[in-house]
Amino acid sequence: MEHKEYAYKMFNKDLTCTLGRGTFQYQPGVWYEELDKEANCRKNGFHVAKNPLDCLSYYHSFEKAQCWIVEIAGDMDEGSCDSKVSAQKIRLVKRLSLSEFVARACMYIMEHPTLAYNYHVTEDKAVADGNHFAIAVGEEPKARGKTGDILGILRTYPDNMEIAEATCFEIDGEEYLPDVWYDAGGKVVAADDQEE
């Protein structure tokens, strides 16, 4: 039986991607196979990421793209700079909303607490950016955003990087208010003196 894994891939809004051989059109649920029988992250294969945040290194705006859970199979080759993987075969499984994307990014951090953080993750405190999300990790993390932004907040144990508590929620203007700092329990926390 062929080995299969799940990963993440971003596409243009029309489900196209630019490959070494040009633009490729995808459809959900269809298996695609690379002509080369050996995947090589530097020159061929279908490129995906194990950390959904790494997709934003290639498609910088979540609003101008689509992020999907994909199933990969066949020969695979891991990249050296982030969680990028090149696979011989790929199939689009599920499109992610922004909240699902951030939740899965938080799950990846929880599963790999000792890996270096993606540049979209901020230590201790984070403010939602142009991609409408913020992820903060630390012993006393906090985050804030505007209405519609998604916050992921992960508290580590004091003596190691393991995650002790985590939350992910949308600033909805009712339960969670805009421009208010929240902790990993989803509770309001005070701003730093210089922020008041």
What positions do the PLM features span?
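Short, glycine-biased loop/turn motifs at secondary-structure junctions and
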Residues: M1-E196
